[in-house]
Amino acid sequence: MYPQQIIDALRHVRYPGTGKDLIESGMLEDDIRISGLEVSFSLIFEKDNDPFMKSVVKAAEVAVQTYVDANAAVHIHTKFRKQNLQPQEEHSPLKAKKIIAIHSGKGGVGKSTVTANLAIALARQGKRVGLLDADIHGPSMPKMFHTEDCRPVSVEEGGRTLIEPIEQYGVKMLSIGFFVDPASAVVWRGGMASNALKQLIEDAHWGELDYFLIDLPPGTSDIHLTLVSLLRLTGAIVVTTPQPVALVDARKGVDMFRNEKIDVPVLGIIENMAWFTPAELPNNRYYIFGHDGGKNLAEELGVPLLGQIPLVQSIREAGDDGEPIAMQEGHPAAKIFDEIARKI
């Protein structure tokens, strides 16, 4: 074995956060050591809580054994450009192991439906889940969780007055929809919306959480920049339909998170409304918005495809009734959300 063979093998491994191979991403340290069938080298990650670290290290090992020598004993060390920073400052009431933003480039692709069902799926798996409805101008979580008439109360914690999130179906939740007239439009400038969002994060009694999901507004706005400045996001999920016009904006969403000023790992793409299945013909699939658009985009950008969700009437009805489909154990759609939840 020769060092150049190792380098060439690692060109076959993509880092999901950028879509580039390990060499192009500058992740290989100049420390390749070879002794007989033993080879060692180091991979450099930006931070020590990189969500892709384990999978990338494994893929690198497999690449050497596949493209260089099947009997190679591969030893991979990890180094970090930045040490792990706490997701929040110590004084913040928000303490979450994973903070995940769920985004769509275009409205109407089912992002909020996906977010609500993922939150419930995680809660049903025994996780402590918080959900922030950050879609200030179009909050939909109160409706989807059947909590339109709920109003958060204040609690005292450590000498501070905090907002107590509404808890429903095992999910702690806050939304601007709890504080405004549901029949009135929220007409705020970017600064007002960002300040309201900041208060829902910093002045709320979230407690200890395993997952904190953020339902982002579609597109790009001040709200997205506010979140990045307030929280150290574990990663982002992009929701799209297979329709070409939606894929254009989904691509922009991935590019936004990969921008060096944002620098948030893209955990994957969810293709919603992947096909239509009528209730009377559960085995039939009609690709009314296109076939595998989200899947193909994920492959092109080098990010995981977390799942494909069909367009079925029961998902829409469950959300409108305030009891998302993920609550229906055994339902085919609930199983899909459960599988996606386990991947994140």
Feature locations, PLM:
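N-proximal, solvent-exposed amphipathic alpha-helical segments enriched in charged/polar residues
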Residues: M1-I32
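Residue-level signature of catalytic and energy-coupling elements of molecular machines
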Residues: L10, L28, A96, G107, ...
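Extreme N-terminal, non-catalytic leader segments
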Residues: E24-M27, S35-H103
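Conserved catalytic-core segment of NTP-binding enzymes
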Residues: V57-K58, D210-Y211, P217-Q308, Q313-E317
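Walker A/P-loop phosphate-binding motif and the immediately C-terminal alpha-helix
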Residues: K98-I136, I262
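Phosphate-binding loop that captures ATP/GTP phosphates
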Residues: L122-A183
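Switch II (G3) loop of P-loop NTPases
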Residues: P152-V155, I176-G191, K198-T226
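C-terminal boundary of histidine-terminating zinc-finger modules
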Residues: D321-H331
